């Protein structure tokens, strides 16, 4: 992972059950020179994260509602348990984040580092990622 004000290169894992979102995020993030791996189920992503000795991911971006039985929030908890604490987790959701305490509790506990309300414009997502990593390293 290298940091400069204008060029952050991260290892990012993206998990979403919607192929268009996976493709869009893959293209967007690779276009910013990030290394990206995508999964369409939380269970596959978790298996990948826990079954190999990988260079740790810098960031996991996961959808909240996933059909595989493991929600994005459950995946976030497991990521924090099984990977280095330096791995950040962004939870994406189409739900109103103010409608439930579950989201604010996840932020307070450190289970997730950011909650991203969908849809999010590409430039805003990039800004959130850059702000999170630049702030963390200063």
What are these model-derived regions, one by one?
Residues 16, 63-64:
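Active-site residues of response regulator receiver
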Residues 38-59:
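Acidic, metal-coordinating helix/loop segments flanking the phosphotransfer/catalytic sites
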Residues 50-55, 79-86, 110:
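Conserved phosphotransfer cores of two-component systems
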Residues 118:
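A Lys-centered signature of the CheY-like receiver
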